[in-house]
Amino acid sequence: IDHDACKRLVDRSITDDRIKELVYAQIDSHGTRGLGLGSEPNQILAVALPSPIDHLLLRTPCVLHSGRYMDDLYCIALDKADLHGVLSDIRAECEKLGIVINDKKTRIVKLSRGFTYLKKRFNYGETGKVIVRPCRSAVTRQRRKLKKLAAFVERGEMTREQALQSYQSWRGSMLKLDARRTVRAMDALFSQLFG
């Protein structure tokens, strides 16, 4: 996140010069680019800075639906050409805001082909039901993590209960998705590793 863009946002929102200086110091406290994680003011700035993009999408008639979670965004429209125009508008707005778009993660796809958003794979079933599964890399990462946790337990650096708690957290999030078979396979791996 561009610090100058954040400071311009603060200038428009805060009138007290002492508070402005305090917020500026917080913005600059973690280098020249980006904001420190965990700080409430930094999280507010990170969410507020791209809000002009949200307003742009609300004013664009061809966009049927759009949404954003932190710095991830999606738009739904009927025509691919319209989406290319919207993407150009978003790029122009991002340039004004000092936001850099990751071209590797930016794409226009047919909804029927499916897409990955927030580490989840979205597809349509034959009946039109939206099927949400975990992306493959998340499952692979968890499998590796379980093996590392088993090594920690074996060396006595962690208890089995702590490993179970970590696994149950991941498992609970997977049960909200269409991932029953994945969860069963991971349960089998957990039983194999931890007995």
Predicted regions and their residues:
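Conserved polymerase palm-domain catalytic core
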Residues: 1-70, 74-89, 99, 109, ...
